[in-house]
C-alpha cells in the first residue's frame, strides 16, 4: 500500500494504473477508521478496481464552535486498518496541500443542503461538496463510495455529480452498526459509557417508528412527535432534529407515501450523533 501526501503523486499513480487497464475507486474519509469505512472498501474491491482512500479532516466543513481541533487523527492506526482491508493508496494531504492559498471557489448544492444538518451546521455541506469535488478532480475515479448514515450528504453528492457532469458512479452503502445497534461513527469515542448507553435510544426509536408505520400510521408529524417523546423519556439527549423527509429530494412530507427517510440528530453531552432509517410507503 502506498501513502501519498501530494496531489501530483496521486495523479501520477492513478495515471499509471489506468494505463494498465484498471478502473479507479475512491473512498473519501476523514480518518479514524471503523468497520463502516472498511465496508466501503470491501464494496470498492468487488469490482477489482485500484482503491484510493482519502484521509483528510477538512476544515471547510467544520463550524467555528465545532470539533475540528479535537477530531480524532491517527494515521498509523488507520494505515494498518486500510492495508488490511485492501486499500491500494491512501491520500493523506496536509491542509496546505488542499488549500494552498485563500480558497475563493466553493461548490454548493442549493436546496438539498438547506435543511436537517445544513440548517444546524451552516456552511457544512458547502465544505463537503467543495472538498469532494476537489478529490474527484484529483483522483478522477470511476466510482466513489459513501456511507448512508450521512444520507443527506449522499443525496447532495449524487446531485452534484449529476449537475456538474462528473463521469463518476456514486455508490451508497447501508449503515453499519455495532452489535447493540449503535451506528458506527468516528465520534462515538467521545461518548462516556453512560452517554453511549443512552445513545442506543436512536436505533430503538427508529425501530419503533418503523413499527408504527407497519401498523398503519401515515402521519409524519405524529411519528416525529412520538420519536421525540421516546428520546426525551429514555435519555438526557438534546434533540437537534427529528424529521421525516422524502428520500428522493428531502422535501417535507405530511402523509407518508413513496420512499421516505426518518432523520435524527441528537446531542449527548458535547457529542452530536446522527442516524436514519429509509422506509418505503404504500
UniProtKB/Swiss-Prot annotation:
Pathway: Cofactor biosynthesis; (R)-pantothenate biosynthesis; (R)-pantothenate from (R)-pantoate and beta-alanine: step 1/1
Subcellular location: Cytoplasm
Pfam families associated with the record: Pantoate_ligase
Sequence positions that bind (R)-pantoate: 61, 153
EC number: 6.3.2.1
GO biological process: pantothenate biosynthetic process
Catalyses which reaction(s): (R)-pantoate + beta-alanine + ATP = (R)-pantothenate + AMP + diphosphate + H(+)
Active-site residues annotated for this sequence: 37 (proton donor)
Regions annotated as coiled coil: none
Molecular function GO labels: ATP binding; pantoate-beta-alanine ligase activity
Binding positions for beta-alanine per the UniProt entry: 61
Enzyme class: ligase
Main location group: cytoplasm
Gene3D superfamilies listed in its UniProt record: HUPs (3.40.50.620), Pantoate-beta-alanine ligase, C-terminal domain (3.30.1300.10)
InterPro entries: Cyt_trans-like (IPR004821), Pantoate_ligase (IPR003721), Pantoate_ligase_C (IPR042176), Rossmann-like_a/b/a_fold (IPR014729)
Other facts noted in the record for this chain: The reaction proceeds by a bi uni uni bi ping pong mechanism.
Similarity section: Belongs to the pantothenate synthetase family.
Name of the protein in question: Pantothenate synthetase
Organism, as annotated: Desulfitobacterium hafniense (strain Y51)
